[in-house]
Swiss-Prot record:
Protein name as it appears in the record: Large ribosomal subunit protein uL3
N6-acetyllysine: modified positions: K136, K286, K294, K366, K373
Linked residues for Glycyl lysine isopeptide (Lys-Gly) (interchain with G-Cter in SUMO1): K294
Ranges of biased composition (kind: Basic residues): 18-31
Phosphoserine sites (modified residues): S13, S304
One GO CC term on file: cytosolic large ribosomal subunit
Post-translational modification summary for this protein: Constitutively monomethylated at His-245 by METTL18. Methylation at His-245 regulates translation elongation by slowing ribosome traversal on tyrosine codons: slower elongation provides enough time for proper folding of synthesized proteins and prevents cellular aggregation of tyrosine-rich proteins It is not required for incorporation of RPL3 into ribosomes.
Cross-link (Glycyl lysine isopeptide (Lys-Gly) (interchain with G-Cter in SUMO2)): K39, K224, K226, K286, K366, K386, K393, K399
Subcellular location: Nucleus, Nucleolus; Cytoplasm
Gene name as annotated: RPL3
Keyword Lyase appears in the UniProt entry: no
Length: 403
């Protein structure tokens, strides 16, 4: 510490080294929850897309606390989660060196958005992926082989996972290539898992079948990229005094003369952001239903509550900034999550047994804010804005042109 007579803790954690750009854009599940055969068969993870943030008002249910039975305002994140399609089954056997893939079976029909994932350039390709494989499901020899594969998986496998992909055409994004991932199937016996997965081949699985209201989940994703940053921004080291020669936002001493190299633990400039991160214990405040047609009418009121009966959708006025409108099922999570808008996020069931009172608290939303997130929004719905503003000039011009 040079001539200082006191020490200080180091700046920045060494637990996240190396701080470099993530090799994958989609968050990777490095461990799934522990299997419990006494529970019914269920999936353990799901993919969603970050739409944006808003705030809610709710009444706290925490007896003995100072805020019990009082209203609190909390920030929430909206993650759009259209149903995922199951297109494959993978069986694993446990070996002394860990899990090993035993067999992989794909469905007969696979959509183009999923096939795009197997090509670097879909436009220039011959688009022949799985054409030979899908014939297995049609001829007699192929069917016999598939039956043998299923029976051998029941006999030898200990872990069953399904291959599922997202439906990009349902989202307000330009990307056409679906995100594909393996999701572990937990609960029941291996035979029950395999039967469950086989029944759902080529079927859609909604998020409501994976997660429940008030559940604590983990969010895995890649953080927002910041580019190449200096040492003060990247490691939050202290700025040097004003009169320092050759810059202030630096580290004055980067180590001793010997060993004659800079240690890995010394804060240096470099990449900041776009790192792979897993955040645990995010509470689900609401699992919302997407737009649906009932009796020939489009039902959008997925942001109404027992206290706020106004007919409004979860979308703020003008849509979510840099995202658009959420028209599919969505998950409302407490607080913030990693990544930028439109970023794909992996939602995973918690690995822990939740015992804390905050984790088990029942959430009853009183109000969901839907004002415009582009500036200082004042109105919750379009009708409220029209009632306050009165007839606008553009309305009068349109009326005159119509007449």
């Amino acid at each position: 510490m040079s001539h200082r007579k006191f020490s200080a803790p180091r700046h920045g954690s060494l637990g996240f080294l190396p701080r470099k750009r993530s090799s994958r854009h989609r968050g990777k599940v490095k461990s799934f929850p522990k299997d419990d055969s006494s529970k019914p068969v269920h999936l353990t993870a799901f993919l969603g897309y970050k739409a944006g943030m808003t705030h809610i008002v709710r009444e706290v249910d925490r007896p003995g606390s100072k805020v019990n039975k009082k209203e609190v305002v909390e920030a929430v994140t909206i993650v759009e989660t259209p149903p995922m399609v199951i297109v494959g089954i993978v069986g694993y056997v446990e070996t002394p060196r860990g899990l090993r893939t035993f067999k992989t079976i794909f469905a007969e029909h696979i959509s183009d958005e999923c096939k795009r994932r197997f090509y670097k350039n879909w436009h220039k390709s011959k688009k022949k992926a799985f054409t030979k494989y899908c014939k297995k499901w049609q001829d007699a020899d192929g069917k016999k082989q598939l039956e043998r594969d299923f029976s051998s998986m029941k006999k030898y496998c200990q872990v069953i996972r399904v291959i599922a992909h997202t439906q990009m055409r349902l989202l307000p994004l330009r990307q056409k290539k679906a995100h594909l991932m393996e999701v572990q199937v937990n609960g029941g016996t291996v035979a029950e898992k395999l039967d469950w997965a086989r029944e759902r081949l080529e079927q859609q699985v909604p998020v409501s079948q994976v997660f429940g209201q008030d559940e604590m989940i983990d969010v895995i994703g890649v953080t927002k990229g910041k580019g190449y940053k200096g040492v003060t921004s990247r490691w939050h080291t202290k700025k040097l005094p004003r009169k320092t020669h050759r810059g202030l936002r630096k580290v004055a001493c980067i180590g001793a003369w010997h060993p004659a190299r800079v240690a890995f633990s010394v804060a240096r400039a470099g990449q900041k952001g776009y790192h792979h991160r897993t955040e645990i214990n995010k509470k689900i405040y609401k699992i919302g239903q997407g737009y649906l047609i009932k009796d020939g009418k489009l039902i959008k009121n997925n942001a109404s509550t027992d206290y706020d009966l106004s007919d409004k959708s979860i979308n703020p006025l003008g849509g979510f900034v840099h995202y658009g409108e959420v028209t599919n099922d969505f998950v409302m999570l407490k607080g913030c999550v990693v990544g930028t808008k439109k970023r794909v996020l992996t939602l995973r069931k918690s690995l822990l047994v939740q015992t804390k009172r905050r984790a088990l608290e029942k959430i009853d939303l009183k109000f969901i804010d839907t004002t415009s997130k582009f500036g200082h929004g004042r109105f919750q719905t379009v009708e409220e804005k029209k009632a306050f503003m009165g007839p606008l000039k553009k309305d009068r011009i349109a009326k005159e042109e119509g007449a």
